[in-house]
Amino acid sequence: MNKILYPKAKITKAQVIEYYIRVAPQILGIVKDRPIVLTRYPNGVDEKGFYEKDRPEGTPPWVKTSTFYSETAKRNVNYILVNDLDTLVWLANLAAIEIHMPLGRVDAREKPDFVLLDLDPEPPANFANAVTVAGLLKEKLDDLGLRAYPKTSGKKGLHVVIPIKREYTYNTTREFAHIIGQYIAKETDLVVSEFSDTKKPNKVFIDYTQNSHGKTMVIPYGLRATPEATVSTPLEWQEVKKELKPESLTLFTVGKRKKDPWKDILENRQKLEVK
């Protein structure tokens, strides 16, 4: 338990476990019944981690799993479901620093309940530029009568997440995200909306491709494998400001936040028949 997982921040495995226990009430409802993908760092984040979809050998029998065919692995995979605190703690004990989830749940894997607008700044564009784009997105989504929830990616970008009714396929949600990105790209030269332009310098790509079967996003309140132990942090819209420093949202600070900006996200599933 005293093993150091974040050398720069001097964070131990015990502290990682304590953090996930603290934020579990905010995490569990959102990740329930989603087949998760892990990135594990048994030797700490300064060493190379490894990606894991399949439940590891020695998985306790009480850990819920879901088995289905993986197109990338070309075989059946036993995916872990983080449906309770014990499973979350067990994963933290495995040094599963990063936990990623799909936008759909196992009972209807092709019917996502979120649309993800992933704002990815290409240097020298930075987080402040992503904030500018997020503001434009909010204005457009407000005009369409859609409520969206922002969070930091835990690295350089922002996620704008729209909760939706489970009535649409990934083809529909991806097309919706693409159209929104194209609209914003016409409003400002800062934005690119086409996958072929993702590496254009000093641009923010509104990544619509994340709305696809098999794609994942880091869970809300999920740790990232950064030197500072940053967290993918749900935000109030009034917090989405250029002055915000994502590197300040860490294991040490996020667990102390008193409000959960995403507390009602599951109660606000919306139709994409926009107003």
PLM region spans:
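Catalytic palm subdomain of template-directed nucleic-acid polymerases
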Residues: 161-173
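Short, conserved phosphate-binding/catalytic loop or strand-edge motifs used
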Residues: 153-162
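C-terminal accessory nucleic-acid interaction domains of nucleic acid-metabolism proteins
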Residues: 1-18, 28, 32-33, 72-77, ...
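Conserved alpha/beta core surface patches that mediate binding of polyanionic ligands
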Residues: 82-109, 131-147
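Charge-rich, low-complexity segments
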Residues: 1-92
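Short beta-strand
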Residues: 39-41, 148-154, 194-198
